């Protein structure tokens, strides 16, 4: 049986740590990658096609897109949607980075055995606790796992274990190397956060590039050389969309019709938008112990993208790119995939979200209609 390993990723942006992860994996590698909107509620620095090209250049065999309402979700829902897509494509293994050395297969077995009891435990916890707090308390109670507050990939890995429970998927945790959430460029593997900060120190307030290829020397030690030039591609960040968000919040009298926005949050948002000067300031004004900053960023993304309370996820899987080996996987999954969005639509919410994303930089190309999967050139 051919080993097919799934990787769930954002690659925002792709760096040497991601290359290291791919190099640790044997067999065929399928990446389920967030599109143009990220799990923690922010636009991707580079568009989905640019990031898919980076992944293919550095070892991925097939890159498929996570629909926007899988990618912009809390960890459990993000993991569940992504694992379902990868399982549908026939993965045997799921690889991910983690700060912990625990056996995640054992964790998946515990959840499979005690799912009902564990979910009931969460529901019985006080409402004033945030969902991440409840989830961590559940894991601590049933497995004895301890959290030190600085293990974001460990938390996500537990969500993968939960999503993979009972699906006959082998979990392969790869030890993280370097400071993956540091905001500074240091020796060794730099974090995506540090790279984004460095890139936007070289751009104007709406993300328009102020540098040429010759100015990429500040990051060249942290990026695979084969994709360094790709870093000169058009970029964006929340600064480009904040005026649109201000307009939406100020004029929409029914924000509670947006996904996960309740009356309390609607009032908080209406009040906060009067004084917030930028996106980060708005998040600071709205968040509470119960409504974490990550949750508020996602809510603001839902508002910008006009996500309704009820929606359906697409059945087909959108292909962003593939290698020769990846083409074999596609051949085995005809009927499940969509390779070109045009006469046949894919996911209305994702396609509309991409239209809004394009407003973030005048140099962004059309994101869906007429775009064909990237085919990796074999050496």
Curated annotation (Swiss-Prot):
Q: Which GO terms describe its molecular function?
A: ATP binding; ligase activity, forming carbon-nitrogen bonds; tRNA binding
Q: Which Pfam families match?
A: HIGH_NTase1
State the top-level EC class: ligase
Q: Does the keyword Secreted apply?
A: no
Q: What is its EC number?
A: 6.3.4.-
Q: Name one GO biological process term.
A: tRNA modification
Q: Record keywords: Transferase included?
A: no
Please name the InterPro entries in this protein's record.
Answer: Rossmann-like_a/b/a_fold, tRNA(Met)_cyd_acetate_ligase
Q: In which residues is ATP bound?
A: 8-21, 97, 153, 176
Question: What are the record keywords, sorted?
Answer: ATP-binding, Cytoplasm, Ligase, Nucleotide-binding, RNA-binding, tRNA processing, tRNA-binding
Task: Write out the annotated subcellular location.
Answer: Cytoplasm
Q: Name one GO cellular component term.
A: cytoplasm
Superkingdom in the source lineage? Bacteria
Q: Which reaction does it catalyse?
A: cytidine(34) in elongator tRNA(Met) + acetate + ATP = N(4)-acetylcytidine(34) in elongator tRNA(Met) + AMP + diphosphate
Described purpose of this protein according to its UniProt entry: Catalyzes the formation of N(4)-acetylcytidine (ac(4)C) at the wobble position of elongator tRNA(Met), using acetate and ATP as substrates. First activates an acetate ion to form acetyladenylate (Ac-AMP) and then transfers the acetyl group to tRNA to form ac(4)C34.
Entry similarity comment: Belongs to the TmcAL family.
- NCBIfam families named among the record's database cross-references: PRK13670.1 (NF010191)
- The protein here is known as tRNA(Met) cytidine acetate ligase
Name of the gene:
tmcAL
